[in-house]
From Swiss-Prot:
Signal peptide range in chain numbering: none
GO biological process, one term: DNA transposition
Protein name from the UniProt record: Uncharacterized protein in dhlA 3'region
Annotated source species: Xanthobacter autotrophicus
Top-rank taxon, per record: Bacteria
PANTHER family for this protein: H REPEAT-ASSOCIATED PREDICTED TRANSPOSASE, PROTEIN YBFL-RELATED
InterPro entries: ISAs1_transpos, Transposase_11, Transposase_11-like, YbfD_N
A GO molecular-function annotation: DNA binding
Xref: Pfam families: DDE_Tnp_1, DDE_Tnp_1_assoc
Amino acid sequence: MSVFAGAAAMLPNPKPFFELIPDPRRATPNKLHSLSDILSIALCAVLSGMDDWEAVAEFGRTKEGWLRQFLPLANGIPSHDTFGRVFSLIDPEAFEAAFFDWAAHARIGGDVLDQLALDGKTVRRSHRGSAGRALHLLHAWSCETRLLVAQRRVDTKSNEITAIPDILSLFDLRGVTISIDAIGCQKAVARQITEAGGDYVLALKGNQSALHDDVRLFMETQADRHPQGQAEAVEKDHGRIETRRIWVNDEIDWLTQKPDWPGLKTLVMVESRRELNGQVSCERRCFITSHTADP
């Protein structure tokens, strides 16, 4: 299968995947561009940071020579109006299926993927009908390619627990680090990741209250002894100053819950201190990971 250069990897040509999407347009002499060409150009443009149809069309014109390496482009680059009209007509579920099929073939895993971040989001203003339930999505992001490589709809945030194993099963996890927020801090999830050859970084919160309390007390004692942390990063932007400090410790044989967590090697605490307009806020978050502590 031919490939094109993606954000940080060699990705498969999206055209064959998009050719499976039904074309909603009538067959007329005015239909100058194939649906798969339009969708493929738009995909490349969005991956390159374009965020409106005029920018997508401009990207196509600027990169036409490169695009012709894997797209016919029989009639050149569509106008921004054509992009907007086509995307307003296509079946969103068919597009979603084709996109995720393409992403699943994008060699996401192994040498290409270093980190996969799973994150649940409730879509704003998505309450449906009289039940008033919002649409909740579980996303899997490739941190290297900046791609949303998988997505699952879940009825409630609590159902992320059942969707996480399903998403993880889509990928080759060998050598990959999986980071998940607190709802994914489950022994079965840790086992699935390590048995597949991956590593995990799992956030701790109230769903593992005893473990969270033990880890937080231990790591805060370490922070009191070494207040500067083992690493520090400072970001300044428009009057906001954010300082992040991190503490890690792999001397955890004292932790009674350690045998229950497959592959657990290291405890982590991250402190985020934000200063804005004279106001200071500070948050500390704890994690468990199967990675060893850096020397």
